[in-house]
Curated annotation (Swiss-Prot):
It comes from Myxococcus xanthus (strain DK1622). NCBIfam families: PRK00136.1. The gene is rpsH. It holds the Pfam family Ribosomal_S8. GO terms for cellular component: ribonucleoprotein complex; ribosome. One of the primary rRNA binding proteins, it binds directly to 16S rRNA central domain where it helps coordinate assembly of the platform of the 30S subunit. This is Small ribosomal subunit protein uS8. Gene3D superfamilies: 3.30.1370.30, 3.30.1490.10. Part of the 30S ribosomal subunit. Contacts proteins S5 and S12. Keywords: Ribonucleoprotein, Ribosomal protein, RNA-binding, rRNA-binding.
Length: 138
């Protein structure tokens, strides 16, 4: 069954795997998803990630996937307590540099798609660039 919102699907997979205390989660590959995962790793919300290819048996089809290692605290509390899609396919949300909202008073991050690439809210404010609010993580 086709997915209408690939980024939303990725965020849901991360949220569900984190709440179920899984060690890793496998996500279908795309350039946008890979950039978001790089930002999550840089911010310390996830561990390592590996891009690999899965071949379907008896077919010559190859599907690239991203295997993400999830992070947990000392008491097995997930590093990602909340992850939410902001800009959706049915209602896109954009913000100028001075209008980018803070998440939980600065304790969380917003991930934006800007003209200079995918970045967190603090970096976008520093570079004075706005963009599409993809998601919030806390």
């Amino acid at each position: 069954m086709p997915v209408n919102d690939p980024v939303g699907d990725m965020l849901t997979r991360l949220r569900n795997a984190s709440r179920a205390r899984h060690d890793k989660v496998v996500i279908p590959h795309s350039k946008l998803k890979l950039e978001i995962i790089k930002v999550l790793k840089d911010e310390g919300y996830i561990g390592e990630f590996v891009v690999h290819e899965q071949t379907v048996q008896n077919k010559r089809t190859v599907f690239p996937e991203i295997s993400v290692q999830l992070k947990y605290g000392p008491d097995r509390a997930p590093a990602i307590t909340g992850i939410r899609r902001v800009s959706k396919p049915g209602l896109r949300r954009y913000a100028a540099a001075r209008e980018i909202p803070q998440v939980l008073g600065g304790l969380g991050i917003s991930i934006l798609s800007t003209s200079r690439g995918i970045m967190v809210d603090s970096e976008a404010r520093k570079q004075k660039v706005g963009g599409e609010l993809l998601c919030t993580v806390y």
